[in-house]
UniProtKB/Swiss-Prot annotation:
The lineage of its organism: Eukaryota, Metazoa, Chordata, Craniata, Vertebrata. It comes from Homo sapiens. GRHL genes (GRHL1, GRHL2 and GRHL3) show a paradoxical lack of redundancy despite their extensive sequence identity in the DNA-binding and protein dimerization domains and the fact that the core consensus DNA binding sites are identical. They have related, but remarkably different functions during embryogenesis because of their differential spatiotemporal expression patterns during development. This is Grainyhead-like protein 3 homolog. PROSITE patterns: GRH_CP2_DB (PS51968). It is found in: Nucleus.
Length: 626
């Protein structure tokens, strides 16, 4: 567009209602004021001139000065030059009233046109002196009037009748629309910010153009779909973003929340070298195989000792109808494993929940969580001999409450910052693979493993091993059918027998049978500690004899005083949990008749977990050495 500015003639009629196609307003002022919603500041003009948009500056300056000023001081400017005319005519203005009475008659109109139309190609100085509108903003050189080539005017060629204003209540839509066309603004997709100090910022909305791509990208080399396998397992949780190269995919889970695990065959069970359509799969939560079995069992025992109940399992299966519609014979083979049978011709789905946190395997606070593996082993059990045919794993980290969702959001924010810092780095392909983990993918594929020889480490506490044997979930029973059991079940018993607790653990478990007593003589005020090797009357007599030098056979009467003050002969077997009427946890008892040795009270402690004396049960007793 040239630097020359055209103006179309604007015809204003008295009491004209609005009849525009795109802008419906009650008056002309509202229409233009709405169009000029932002003030035209000096900074805005300067920025538009820098962008080479002088024509828009001139046009907007004209509209703003006209419609934003007082109504009684507006200038009526008329132009007769078209947009394609080489010659331009500029006219003087005149003050007008709101009703435009002088322009209603043809005589006044012709007089106005003949007095104000000038053929001079330069701007007259009278416009500035009379405070009329100046068009210096549209000139290439500010402050100097640029001469324009003379050309024919429409006023000279047209007839007088063409300029007569008819008495009508409608706007001339063509004249106003032509003014809109002469203003070259920004495209509709961009918003013009007058006070912005930036020239343009089109890259801000396209910081991550690869995320918005709809074309499928090739999966990462570590992804399971890129590998050919007879079985395909998925976990209904989003895949973690930050995964080291060569590691299994990782998913974040919430403790106690159930997630779907889907098992299927890509070919619908066709082409599989199986003896039957039904296979048995074992879903288990295990540690990485790099940890030796002894260390893994030590971790599980540490976790189990901190649980509120001994029946707490590592992995649970949801009791819902969808599980029983696709799988059958669900069995809890260990505390960290469960098995079921499913048909390879159909898709199987079970809902599992993990009840341990990644930080439950250390007594220290603030340590990094230990990642676990969700492992699925599938056995062919059609001909009576079970054979491991497939294994797949994925890493899982378990958080409390809604920690899994928070961890995913934190990883996404870190990934975004990394993309902003190095958008054109050489490892953009790797980052694209990382970003593909959360592009609408709410499942995590388990990666197939080639190692089918290493047996899994299953955790079965010693206190419940016998019950598992009775239920047929741990060790094979004697008989001809024992050889038909799964290899997994046959390995449960050897694991428990082979990896017994360490010798230090055995010694500490023996110390649990010991009892610590506090006794004193009748003349003493301070109690002395007395250790009983066995929690019975014989152990008490033996300890008193060793500490105070009394012959053990001389201690033949031992009394106990109940809370109600009653005294009775102590049973030869000291109970580790006395009845409530024998509990007294405050002060030693008073003197009892026929008490010749002294008094004391029962105080028991766990030597393994707490080295400091802690009162568990208190029992007052009296020893008579007569």
């Amino acid at each position: 567009m040239s630097n020359e500015l055209d103006f179309r003639s604007v015809r204003l009629l008295k009491n004209d209602p609005v009849n525009l196609q795109k802008f419906s307003y009650t008056s002309e002022d509202e229409a233009w004021k709405t169009y000029l919603e932002n003030p035209l500041t000096a900074a805005t003009k300067a920025m538009m001139r820098v962008n080479g948009d002088d024509d828009s500056v001139a046009a907007l300056s004209f509209l703003y000065d006209y419609y934003m000023g007082p109504k009684e001081k507006r200038i009526l400017s008329s132009s007769t030059g078209g947009r394609n005319d080489q010659g331009k005519r500029y006219y003087h203005g005149m003050e007008y009233e709101t009703d435009l009475t002088p322009l209603e008659s043809p005589t006044h109109l012709m007089k106005f046109l003949t007095e104000n139309v000038s053929g001079t190609p330069e701007y007259p100085d009278l416009l500035k002196k009379n405070n009329l509108m100046s068009l210096e903003g549209a000139l290439p050189t500010p402050g100097k009037a640029a001469p324009l080539p003379a050309g024919p005017s429409k006023l000279e060629a047209g007839s007088v009748d063409s300029y007569l204003l008819p008495t009508t209540d409608m706007y001339d839509n063509g004249s106003l629309n032509s003014l809109f066309e002469s203003i070259h603004g920004v495209p509709p997709t961009q918003r013009w910010q007058p006070d912005s100090t930036f020239k343009d910022d089109p890259q801000e909305s396209m910081l991550f153009p690869d995320i918005l791509k709809t074309s499928p990208e090739p999966p990462c080399p570590e992804d399971y779909p890129s590998l050919k396998s007879d079985f395909e397992y998925t976990l209904g949780s989003p895949k973690a973003i930050h995964i080291k190269s060569g590691e299994s995919p990782m998913a974040y889970l919430n403790k106690g929340q159930f997630y779907p695990v889907t098992l299927r065959t890509p070919a619908g069970g066709k082409g599989l070298a199986l003896s039957s359509n039904k296979v048995k799969s074992v879903v288990m939560v295990v540690f990485d195989n790099e940890k030796v079995p002894v260390e893994q069992l030590r971790f599980w025992k540490h976790w189990h000792s901190r649980q509120p109940t001994a029946k707490q399992r590592v992995i649970d299966v949801a009791d819902c109808k969808e599980n029983f519609n696709t799988v059958e014979h669900i069995e809890e083979v260990a505390y960290n494993a469960l098995s079921f049978v499913w048909n390879v011709n159909e898709e199987a789905k079970v809902f599992i929940g993990v009840n341990c946190l990644s930080t439950d395997f250390s007594s220290q606070k603030g340590v990094k969580g230990v990642p676990l593996n969700l492992q699925i082993d599938t056995y062919d059990c059609g001909l009576g001999t079970e054979r491991l045919v497939h294994r797949a794993v994925c890493q899982i980290k378990i958080f409390c409450d809604k920690g899994a969702e928070r961890k995913m959001r934190d990883d996404e924010r870190k990934q975004f910052r990394r993309k902003v810092k190095c958008p054109d780095s050489s490892n953009s392909g790797v980052k694209g693979c990382l970003l593909s983990g959360f592009r609408g993918n709410e499942t995590t594929y388990l990666r197939p493993e080639t190692d089918l020889e290493t047996p899994p480490v299953l955790f079965i506490p010693n206190v419940h091993f016998s019950s598992l044997q009775r239920s047929g979930g741990a060790a094979p029973s004697a008989g001809p059918s024992s050889s038909n059991r799964l290899p997994l079940k046959r390995t449960c018993s050897p694991f428990t027998e082979e990896f017994e607790p360490l010798p230090s653990k055995q010694a500490k478990e023996g110390d649990l049978q010991r009892v610590l007593l506090y006794v004193r003589r009748e003349t003493e005020e301070v109690f002395d500690a007395l250790m009983l090797k066995t929690p019975d009357l014989k152990g008490l007599r033996n300890a008193i004899s060793e500490k105070y030098g009394f012959p053990e056979e001389n201690i033949y009467k031992v009394y106990k005083k109940c809370k109600r003050g009653e005294t009775s002969l102590l049973h030869p077997r000291l109970s580790r949990h006395p009845p409530p009427d024998c509990l007294e946890c405050s002060h030693p008892v008073t003197q009892v008749r026929n008490m010749g040795f002294g008094d004391g009270f029962w105080r028991q402690r766990d030597l393994d977990s707490n080295p400091s004396p802690t009162t568990v049960n208190s029992l007052h007793f009296t020893v008579n050495s007569e």
